[in-house]
Structure formats: C-alpha cells, structure tokens
Amino acid sequence: MSAPSLVQAVAKRGWLNKMLKPVSNWYINAAGYRQMGLRADDLISEENETVLAALQRLSPKESYDRIYRIRRATQLSLTHKLLPKNEWTTQEEDVPYLRPLIDQIEAEAAEKDALDTLAVVKN
C-alpha cells in the first residue's frame, strides 16, 4: 500500500516546505473533495486487504461518519451539486484518521514477516 513519498524530504527543509505549501493548498482545493464534505482519507480505495483491516479497526462513530460522508458525496455527485460553503471540510477537520491505522497494520505485517523468516542459529 505504501508508495514512495517525498514528505520527509520536504519536511526537513523549511524553505522547500514554505515554497510548496501554497501549491499544495491550491491542489487540495482544486481536487474538490473538501467541497463535497470528504476528508483525504475517505479517498483511499477499499480494494486492499490492509485498508479493509484498517477500516475494521475504526471506532463505530468514525466508521459511521466515513460512510455518511461518502454517501453524501455520492449523492452530490449524482445531482451535480456542491455543499454550501459553510459545510465544506476545512483544513483543520481534514486530519488523517485511516492512514495511521494503515501504517500500523503495515508495520505489524513487516514485523510478522521478519519473525517468520527468522533463522535460529544453534551453537
């Protein structure tokens, strides 16, 4: 599930972060998912076993909220409308809720794989 990322490289260099932040904000607004009330993690495809496991670990409230946001966005898409501006997802509300769980599951899988391939040396 993990793809190559430049996040750490950009975060280490303050000048690069300041330079790319306006471009990042413009791109997020141009994507339009916030105008439909979605969060960035709502866009992660559910066709992966890791993501399905992460979705099962969500709290019932967060799971319900996610389904509600996706259904509302689907209805808006079908009617070719956007939410009123006061209902758009703000930058403060758009926090990752699924990505930390995915990272945790991937780390657990890597640890399990490392332990499964562990070679025991007997002296």
Curated annotation (Swiss-Prot):
Annotated function: Component of the ubiquinol-cytochrome c oxidoreductase, a multisubunit transmembrane complex that is part of the mitochondrial electron transport chain which drives oxidative phosphorylation.
Chief location bin: mitochondrion
Taxonomic superkingdom: Eukaryota
Official protein name in the record: Cytochrome b-c1 complex subunit 7
Example GO molecular function: ubiquinol-cytochrome-c reductase activity
Keywords: Electron transport, Membrane, Mitochondrion, Mitochondrion inner membrane, Respiratory chain, Transport
Family: Belongs to the UQCRB/QCR7 family.
GO CC annotations, alphabetized: matrix side of mitochondrial inner membrane; respiratory chain complex III
Membrane topology: Peripheral membrane protein
UniProt cross-references to InterPro entries, sorted A to Z: QCR7, QCR7_sf
GO terms of biological process kind: mitochondrial electron transport, ubiquinol to cytochrome c; mitochondrial respiratory chain complex III assembly
Subunit text: Component of the ubiquinol-cytochrome c oxidoreductase (cytochrome b-c1 complex, complex III, CIII), a multisubunit enzyme composed of 10 subunits. The complex is composed of 3 respiratory subunits cytochrome b (cob), cytochrome c1 (cyt-1) and Rieske protein (fes-1), 2 core protein subunits pep and ucr-1, and 5 low-molecular weight protein subunits qcr6, qcr7, qcr8, qcr9 and probably NCU16844/qcr10.
Cellular location(s): Mitochondrion inner membrane
